[in-house]
Amino acid sequence: KCWLTSQEAGRLMGIGSELVRSAVITSEIVGKVSIKGQNRFVSVHRDVVETVRQNRLLYVTTTEARRRLGVSKLVFERLIQSGALEKKTKAQRPALVSAEFLAKDVDALVSRLLEGVLPRQIEKSLWAGFQDISIKRGIPDASICVIMQKILHQEIRPIALLPGASGVSGLRFDFSEIKACIAEDEPEY
């Protein structure tokens, strides 16, 4: 069977049949609309369904991206603000894809940060994770984004990785190195 109803297509794609019907009617995806009396029947070719299904697998939601990174909402937002990941707009995504981040970008970010670990022996009280780069630890809000960018560009490299932590949540940085960055950024009067 090459042509599928909107219900069958929706089930295979992992979305509601109403979205499939709407996408065909608005020509967002290719399909057939046949009108019989008062009823409008929508059918979608199996190849189109498979293409949409594959496209949907390439993207991850914000929640899934955070889970893969192993970070809180606040840390995730700071990573986004510092340019770690590009949030795709609806126009940049394929038809019927609602997730905003490319899965390969998220995985590449995790790999890049984990590969950047440069082990050094320092006192554990000076260790800081992503969650510690905050106002609570004495870092001004304006400097947080700059520090995150330096971490992303590997100007500040992690000194340790806690075993068993998911994503980048186990990375530990030298807090004195982070504090030194703040001193560099402070304007001199």
List each model region and its residues.
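Intrinsically disordered, low-complexity regulatory/linker segments
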Residues: K1-Y189
